[in-house]
């Protein structure tokens, strides 16, 4: 009985923590081998949000500013208490080397594909040592940051946990 009560209290406190959020945030960061890159964005609000007023920005290798081709305007609508998964657009099953396709497991999770041509836009080509920013365009407000802008932790990423890994935001992190 005590375990059941503890579990119920834990679930209630987790729900209340999410209730404290009032802005979009990066809920999952996937930096897999080769082109297996994705960002999941969570909408903790009670309203659907049109993503055309938001963008992802990549601050490459310790840069203090994102270049124009490292910023991508998002699309789609995130329903209340739901996510959209943005995946690097490498879908050609015959692609090799730099054009290798994302793995089927990741492709199945994709809601929206981004940045198919590196030379045109490479915001989704992060590699474990780049900071990623979710920004609202109309207000220029930074809603969330993954990593540290202006810091290059080396090719292994922050404490060797960001390169070739998937990171999921812990439920108790609300700001």
Q: What residue spans do the PLM features occupy?
A:
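Sec-dependent N-terminal signal peptides
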Residues: 3-15, 19
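A structural motif detector for short, solvent-exposed N-terminal "entry" segments of globular domains
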Residues: 19-61, 124-127, 150
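Structural recognition of the beta-strand scaffold that forms the well-ordered cores
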Residues: 25-28, 40, 55-58, 83-87, ...
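Short, surface-exposed secondary-structure edge patches
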Residues: 46-48, 73-77, 123, 159
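Conserved beta-structured recognition patch
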Residues: 112-175
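Short, Lys/Arg- and Gly-enriched loop/turn segments at beta-strand edges
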Residues: 91-109
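Intrinsically disordered, low-complexity Pro/Gly/Ser/Thr-rich segments with frequent PxxP/GP/PP motifs
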Residues: 66-96
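Acidic glycine-/aspartate-rich tracts in secreted/extracellular proteins
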Residues: 32-33, 44-48, 60-64, 89-93, ...
């Amino acid at each position: 009985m005590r375990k059941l009560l503890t579990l119920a209290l834990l679930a209630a406190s987790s729900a209340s923590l999410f209730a404290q959020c009032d802005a979009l945030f990066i809920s999952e960061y996937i930096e897999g081998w080769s082109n297996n890159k994705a960002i999941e964005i969570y909408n903790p609000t009670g309203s659907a949000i049109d993503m055309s007023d938001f963008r992802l920005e990549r601050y490459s290798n310790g840069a203090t500013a994102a270049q124009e081709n490292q910023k991508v305007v998002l699309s789609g609508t995130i329903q209340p208490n739901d996510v959209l998964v943005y995946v690097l657009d490498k879908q050609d099953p015959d692609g090799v080397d730099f054009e290798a396709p994302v793995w089927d497991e990741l492709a199945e999770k994709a809601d929206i594909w981004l940045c198919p041509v590196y030379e045109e836009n490479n915001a989704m080509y992060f590699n474990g040592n780049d900071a990623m920013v979710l920004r609202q365009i109309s207000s220029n407000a930074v809603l969330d940051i993954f990593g540290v802008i202006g810091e290059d932790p080396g090719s292994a990423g922050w404490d060797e946990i960001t390169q070739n890994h998937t990171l999921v935001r812990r439920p108790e992190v609300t700001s």
